[in-house]
Regions:
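Non-catalytic accessory regions flanking glycosidase/transglycosidase catalytic cores in CAZymes
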Residues: 1-192
Length: 192
């Protein structure tokens, strides 16, 4: 007997899309937009979600330094491998750019929060930036919804899914794992 199963392409988990190296070549940093060919391929695939800022490289991602004009953004430490002399990675493909792309292709962001450098307040600020309505400022302090609006997106991004860190025990096969830096730091401070 033949069985036929219909699969809704929106129910297929999407892609793990990294911020580094201009989205690994899918983002045009000169024009600050996704490359047209990638957009078409993505739409054809019908992915329903985008995991950002990536997997293990998200462990040291500082979302706040990816906001605003690219000339003012600070380089990131790659969260997986950090080869000597690398000098950091320009976060051209930042949180605003991935959110704009997600809107364009009708996909949902699955945000991987940086357990390696974040804290509860930073995570709350991120949720406010992504999801708060302008004028609400639920965390007090910096009005992150207004920062989002000032960066060109007045409506909330409505991100529903968050992961906390990624493979925190993973070692780097092609460089020095960021976890090795944390271990050395903690040992030097007498922390076990």
């Amino acid at each position: 007997e033949e069985v036929t199963q219909h699969i809704d392409s929106k129910s297929i988990f999407g892609i793990n899309h990294r911020y580094a190296f201009n989205g690994y070549g899918t983002f045009d940093s000169k024009n600050m937009k996704m490359k047209d060919e990638f957009v078409e391929l993505y739409k054809d695939a019908g992915f329903g979600s985008i995991r950002y800022p990536g997997g293990t490289i998200s462990n040291l991602f500082n979302w706040k330094t990816t906001l605003g004009p690219k000339e003012q953004r600070k380089k990131q430490i790659h969260g997986f491998y950090n080869n000597q002399g690398q000098g950091g990675i320009a976060p051209n493909f930042g949180i605003g750019e991935i959110a704009t792309f997600a809107d364009e292709v009708d996909s949902e962001i699955v945000y991987v929060y940086s357990l390696g450098r974040g804290n509860a307040q930073d995570a709350a600020d991120l949720v406010e930036y992504l999801n708060a309505k302008v004028g609400t400022n639920p965390n007090g302090g910096i009005d992150w919804a207004q920062v989002r609006a000032d960066n060109g997106h007045t409506e909330p991004y409505n991100v529903r899914y968050f992961e906390i860190g990624n493979e925190m025990n993973l070692g780097g096969e092609d460089g020095t794992a960021s976890q090795e830096y944390w271990t050395k730091y903690a040992q030097n401070k007498g922390v076990e």
